[in-house]
Amino acid sequence: MYDYIKGQLTKITAKYIVVEANGLGYMINVANPYSFTDSVNQLVTIYLHQVIREDAHLLFGFHTKDEKDVFLKLISVSGIGPTTALAIVAVDDNEGLVNAIDNSDIKYLMKFPKIGKKTAQQMVLDLAGKFVEAPQETGNTKARSNKAGNTQLDEAIEALLALGYKATELKKIRAFFEGTSETAEQYIKSALKLLMKG
């Protein structure tokens, strides 16, 4: 098992990043790949969780230990796999997640992709009181204005689709942001907040 990787960030896609270490390129699934844009071709440290399946060995990566801790707690819940957990971690307001669990707010939890009533109830049952404190905001929140525009919005929509959000939901998101100029990372952060508001 891996705890973290330190290497050069060489590639960003809508679903994953690639970090090169010791001559090998590691494909790492992350919640918001575009939050790493400022670190391309730079040395990065990514906290890791490895999932071994019969057909694949998958790596899931995180900016911080807190983010990884939230992910690990989520995948301990019956009915939540790593992809769904990653989609939940993608939402900046992890404090909202913790509050919803501790206050048995099933309706809020059901706003996450692939989380139905039964799984939301299981989250409350398994995780209530397990978070000592709400994790800090994750990722790089520094605003960037380069490469803004429709291409950035397209990349954000693609990343949200990869997290499990429905195309019908994202049509409204696209319409909401048309004509604006942000980075893909900023679009994703704003879109996730809108999606959680319903």
From Swiss-Prot:
Biological process according to GO: DNA recombination; DNA repair
**Which InterPro entries does this entry report, sorted A to Z?**
DNA_helicase_Holl-junc_RuvA_I, Hlx-hairpin-Hlx_DNA-bd_motif, NA-bd_OB-fold, RuvA, RuvA_2-like, RuvA_C, RuvA_C_sf
Q: Does the keyword DNA repair apply?
A: yes
Q: Which UniProt keywords apply?
A: Cytoplasm, DNA damage, DNA recombination, DNA repair, DNA-binding
Which residues does the annotated region (Domain III) include? Answer: 148-198
The record's function comment reads: The RuvA-RuvB-RuvC complex processes Holliday junction (HJ) DNA during genetic recombination and DNA repair, while the RuvA-RuvB complex plays an important role in the rescue of blocked DNA replication forks via replication fork reversal (RFR). RuvA specifically binds to HJ cruciform DNA, conferring on it an open structure. The RuvB hexamer acts as an ATP-dependent pump, pulling dsDNA into and through the RuvAB complex. HJ branch migration allows RuvC to scan DNA until it finds its consensus sequence, where it cleaves and resolves the cruciform DNA.
* Name under which the protein is recorded: Holliday junction branch migration complex subunit RuvA
Native organism is Streptococcus pyogenes serotype M18 (strain MGAS8232)
In the UniProt record, the gene name given for this protein reads ruvA
